Amino acid sequence: MSIRVLIADDSAVMRDAIARTLNADPALEVVGEAASFAETLKQASTLNPDIVLLDLHMPDESRYLPEIVKGPLLENTGCILAISVWNDEEAKSLAKNIGAVALLDKAHLSSDLISSIKMYCMKD
């Protein structure tokens, strides 16, 4: 049985790169992609992914991020991994507030993604 992943990033190029990386591992299955927080909430509630890879900064963040912080995303997924181009204290705090288990730097995503998923989200 594969681990179901929802990719949430406003960049189609980034979503495609992440999907290619994940699809190279037979234990992982990309079940959906979202380009906004609104889409992420909707898809998470219908797809019930095991993992959500969530970009912290998308165009509709001011409207939906407070809603995400309240926890509805966690109700529909087992693990949130935040991704961002920023790794400052503000980003780390935001990742923690939304219930993410870790904040991954987009600059190192290709080398860190699979190992981070296995470390933080895959239970034996």
PLM regions and their residue ranges:
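Conserved acidic segment of CheY-like receiver
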Residues: S2-M14, I18, L22
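Short amphipathic alpha-helix used as the core "switch/output" element in two-component signaling
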Residues: S62-N76
